[in-house]
């Protein structure tokens, strides 16, 4: 009878832990729903509080997670929709609306350049087209890249996945493959594939995760996420899209990461994408010293690093733009 009682106690304890885990998942979903239903003024105040730097031509915003840059049929609020009000609240009621200079994915945080004039916006956009803007990202990944530093030069294209849950994702389109005999063969890259080049280096690793610095040379959709997940087998923490190829499912981090973060598998569904645009370097309008714009890591990102026992980097540790 004692053994049966002990088993019942363990069963009750496991049930209680499962209920607590499911409650936390529901609470996280409720917070996200509450944020989505918040009045516009809440989004406006949040965006205004994230203005990192400004001058007569440009404004640098540390974009928060979950706020899309552009609107759409299913998007109620975006950075673009807030720009007229942001300009008036920040610079006065006679201020002209700010202009978007580039994109940043909804779930990516960090440096977003806004222009105060049309001329400044066009100048930044031209520099981006001519690859004169150097971008640096920090990503918290599952696993550790091997090698720890290098260059990924693998084209990317959109493909339809196989399996019962067919959908479209960006995917690698390698120039080479290994034959059954072990020989390296060159393959023809489809015309729909885009050149994609990323420099990377590992800044620190612990608890089954690593902090990686990324220097994208090109700007293909989801380039960093695809290169890390499919090129290095190190998906970004919270990347529920590219952690699985043929199915739509939440990311399942390894046990070592879950233990360090104090999470269960159900709770890991609410993890946000840990990808941050930390620095943008662009040419100055008068041809003098380049303009370096930096945005510190958000609190949630730094909190995750502490739990994983990965030392948080400082902005001074950033490598300078490559000269080649």
UniProtKB/Swiss-Prot annotation:
It is an enzyme of class 5 (isomerase). It comes from the Eukaryota. The active site is at 105. Its EC number is 5.4.99.-. GO terms for molecular function: RNA binding; tRNA pseudouridine synthase activity. Gene3D superfamilies: Pseudouridine synthase. It catalyses: uridine in 5S rRNA = pseudouridine in 5S rRNA; a uridine in tRNA = a pseudouridine in tRNA; a uridine in mRNA = a pseudouridine in mRNA. Keywords: Cytoplasm, Isomerase, Mitochondrion, mRNA processing, mRNA splicing, Nucleus, rRNA processing, Transit peptide, tRNA processing. It is found in: Mitochondrion matrix; Nucleus; Cytoplasm. Residues 1-11 form a transit peptide. InterPro entries: PsdUridine_synth_cat_dom_sf, PsdUridine_synth_RluA-like_CS, PsdUridine_synth_RsuA/RluA, RluA_PseudoU_synthase. One of its GO terms (biological process) is mRNA processing. Catalyzes uridine to pseudouridine isomerization (pseudouridylation) of different mitochondrial RNA substrates. Acts on position 1397 in 16S mitochondrial ribosomal RNA (16S mt-rRNA). This modification is required for the assembly of 16S mt-rRNA into a functional mitochondrial ribosome. Acts on position 39 in mitochondrial tRNA(Phe). Also catalyzes pseudouridylation of mRNAs in nucleus: acts as a regulator of pre-mRNA splicing by mediating pseudouridylation of pre-mRNAs at locations associated with alternatively spliced regions. Belongs to the pseudouridine synthase RluA family. This is Pseudouridylate synthase RPUSD4, mitochondrial. It comes from Xenopus tropicalis (Western clawed frog). The lineage of its organism: Eukaryota, Metazoa, Chordata, Craniata, Vertebrata.
